Regions:
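Detector for the c-type heme attachment site
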Residues: 139-145, 275, 432-433, 446
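Radical SAM/AdoMet-radical enzyme domain recognition
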Residues: 158, 162-178, 187-311
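C-terminal accessory region of radical SAM enzymes
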Residues: 327-361, 391-438
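Cysteine-cluster motifs in flexible loop/terminal segments that predominantly coordinate metals
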Residues: 418, 422-469
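Conserved alpha-helical substructure of the radical SAM core
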Residues: 79-226, 231
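Acidic, low-complexity/disordered tracts enriched in E/D and polar residues
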Residues: 1-58
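Short Fe-S-cluster ligation motifs
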Residues: 162-180, 455-489
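Short acidic, hydrophobic short linear motifs in intrinsically disordered regions
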Residues: 61-75
Length: 489
C-alpha cells in the first residue's frame, strides 16, 4: 500500500468512479482521508488533495491541462506550484507503470472457464433440526420448518452426509460442516454422534473436519459449551443487540422475550471459549436503523467478535428495510468505523465481520470472481438428506439438486450456479466493488428479482458502503503500524 503525504480537509464524504475501457478507479473521501482504489490490482492508496484531483483527471487530460486546472483550483495555496503538480503527475505515472494504478481487467476471460472447472464439494450445511424453540418474526426459515414439516435429522442421515462429503471432496483436506437449523441444539445428541463419526474416519481419509455450530442460545448449558469448545472451529451466537430490540422480534413460543435467558449463557460461553473462534451475529431491521447502538451494546456485554446483517424479508413486511433507510444506514457504518478505531486506541478493540479485509492478501481471484460456491462447492442437506444450493434455498423444490444417496442429479440447476459469477451480471459491469462482493448473494438476488443472476440493488449499496468503511479502517490501521503522523482516528 502506497501512502502519500496528507493534507487534512473538512469532514465529508464524496465518491466517484473512473471507468475507462478496461480500467477502473474508485475515489472517495471518508473520515478525513482521500482514498483511491485501483479495482483490478487491488491497490489502495491514501493520498493528499492534489494527488486525489490529479488522479481524477489523469486519463482524460494532458499534463499541461492538468497543471493549468490544478493551478487554478489551488490558486490560494502557495505550496501548490507548477513543479509540485508536475512531480505529482510523475508519481501517478510511476504507480501506473508499477501496476498499482489504472490497471487493466485481466480476469474476465477466467470467468468463462468457471462452468468447465471440475469443482469438489468443500462444505456442507447440515440442517440438523427443522424445528425451533423461538418464534422469530423475521425468520426466513419459517420458524425453522422451511415451509415444510418439523423434523430432526437422524444419525443415519448425518453419517451418510459425512460420507458423501468425503466422497465428493477429492484431494481437499480441510472440510467444513455447519450445524444449522432451526435450532441445532434441539438435536444435540445427533450433533455429537455425527462429530464423533467424522473424527473416527478423518485420518483414514486424510481429512480435517472443521465444525461450526449456530445457536439461538436457549439450550446452551455446560455440556454444550464443553463440547463446542472441544470440537467446533467456530460458533455463531444469535443476538440482535439491545434488550428491547432483541425481544421485539426474537420471542419464545409463548410470546416472551429471549434476551434475559440467552445473554448470560452467551457470556459464559465466550468466557470459556478462550481464543477459539466465535462471533455474535445480529440482524437489523427497519425498527433499529440505529444498529450501531446494538453493536456497541453487545461489545459492552463483553462480546468482541461481532456481525450485524440487514434483514432479508419480503418488501411489504413491517420490519423490512426501505430505500429511504439507506442514508441512515450509511451514516451508521461510518459511525461504526470511527468507534472501532477509537476503541482500539483505548485498548478495547472489537472485530466487525464486514470490516475484516486484508489489504496485502485476501481470497484468490477465482473466489473473488465466483463467490461462496453455493450449489457447487457448498450445499445444504435437509433432515431427509436432500441437497440444495444453500440454506436459503431449502424448501424451494425447483432448486433441489439431488440427495446424499444418489448425488447431484439436477445438473441444470447446478450449472446455473456454476455460471454465477461477477461477469455474468451485466449490472455489475461498471461496479467498483465487484471483485470484493463476487456478484453478491445468489439467494438474495433470487428473492429480490426472481433470478439467481439478478441484482439486489439495496444490498449492493449497503455492501459498497461497508467496503468503503472497511478499506478506510484498514488503511488507518496500516498507517498506525507504520507510525504515520496522520494516522489519527
Amino acid at each position: 500500500m502506497i501512502i502519500k503525504d496528507y493534507r487534512r480537509f473538512p469532514k465529508g464524504l464524496t465518491a466517484f468512479l473512473l471507468s475507462n475501457g478496461d480500467i477502473m478507479i474508485h475515489q472517495y473521501k471518508l473520515n478525513g482521508y482521500n482514498i483511491v482504489l485501483d479495482v483490478y490490482s487491488g491497490s489502495v492508496h491514501a493520498v493528499d488533495d492534489l494527488a486525489y484531483d490529479v488522479i481524477a483527471m489523469y486519463k482524460n487530460a494532458t499534463k499541461e491541462q492538468i497543471i493549468d486546472e490544478m493551478l487554478s483550483k489551488y490558486a490560494d495555496n502557495p505550496e501548490i506550484t507548477k513543479e509540485e503538480i508536475s512531480e505529482c503527475i510523475d508519481d501517478v505515472k510511476e504507480l501506473e507503470e508499477q501496476g498499482k494504478l489504472f490497471t487493466d481487467d485481466k480476469y474476465e476471460n477466467l470467468a468463462f472457464d468457471f462452468k468447465k472447472r471440475n469443482t469438489v464439494i468443500k462444505a456442507l450445511c447440515l440442517h440438523i433440526a427443522h424445528t425451533c424453540n423461538l418464534n422469530c418474526e423475521y425468520c426466513f426459515a419459517s420458524q425453522g420448518k422451511y415451509h415444510g414439516e418439523r423434523a430432526l435429522m437422524s444419525f443415519e442421515v448425518g453419517k451418510r452426509a459425512i460420507d458423501f462429503l468425503i466422497e465428493n471432496s477429492g484431494s481437499r483436506v480441510n472440510l467444513e460442516v455447519d450445524f444449522f437449523g432451526g435450532e441445532p441444539l434441539m438435536n444435540f445428541d445427533v450433533v455429537k454422534q455425527i462429530v464423533a463419526y467424522a473424527r473416527s474416519i478423518e485420518k483414514e481419509h486424510n481429512k480435517n473436519f472443521r465444525f461450526t455450530l449456530t445457536t439461538n442460545g436457549m439450550l446452551v448449558d455446560d455440556d454444550v459449551i464443553e463440547f463446542a469448545n472441544k470440537e467446533c472451529h467456530n460458533v455463531v451466537l444469535s443476538l440482535d443487540g439491545r434488550k428491547e430490540v432483541h425481544d421485539h422480534l426474537r420471542k419464545t413460543v409463548n410470546g416472551k422475550g429471549s434476551y434475559d435467558i440467552i445473554v448470560p449463557k452467551f457470556q459464559e460461553f465466550v468466557k470459556k471459549r478462550g481464543n477459539k473462534g466465535y462471533y455474535v451475529r445480529g440482524t437489523y431491521t427497519h425498527n433499529n436503523t440505529d444498529f450501531t447502538n446494538d453493536i456497541f451494546h453487545m461489545a459492552d456485554l463483553g462480546f468482541t467478535e461481532l456481525s450485524m446483517e440487514p434483514v432479508v424479508c419480503a418488501p411489504d413486511d413491517p420490519y423490512a428495510l426501505t430505500y429511504d433507510d439507506l442514508p441512515i444506514l450509511f451514516e451508521q457504518y461510518e459511525i461504526l468505523a470511527k468507534e472501532m478505531l477509537k476503541r482500539e486506541k483505548e485498548g478495547r478493540p472489537l472485530t466487525f465481520y464486514h470490516y475484516m479485509i486484508d489489504l496485502k492478501g485476501g481470497p484468490c481471484i477465482y473466489k473473488r470472481i465466483s463467490g461462496c460456491g453455493s450449489g457447487t462447492e457448498y450445499m445444504a442437506v435437509t433432515p431427509w438428506g436432500d441437497l440444495y444450493p444453500c440454506h436459503q434455498f431449502v424448501g424451494e423444490e425447483a432448486f433441489k439438486l439431488g440427495d446424499i444417496y444418489t448425488g447431484v442429479t439436477n445438473k441444470k440447476i447446478q450449472d446455473e450456479f456454476a455460471s454465477c459469477n461477477v461477469y455474468a451480471r451485466k449490472e455489475c459491469a461498471d461496479c467498483w466493488a465487484r471483485l470484493y462482493c463476487s456478484g453478491g448473494c445468489a439467494a438474495n438476488a433470487y428473492h429480490a428479482t426472481g433470478s439467481v443472476k439478478g441484482v439486489y440493488k439495496e444490498g449492493c449499496e449497503l455492501f459498497c458502503k461497508r467496503l468503503e468503511c472497511a478499506l478506510a479502517v484498514a488503511i488507518i490501521r496500516d498507517m498506525k503500524e507504520k507510525n504515520h503522523e496522520d494516522a489519527d482516528c
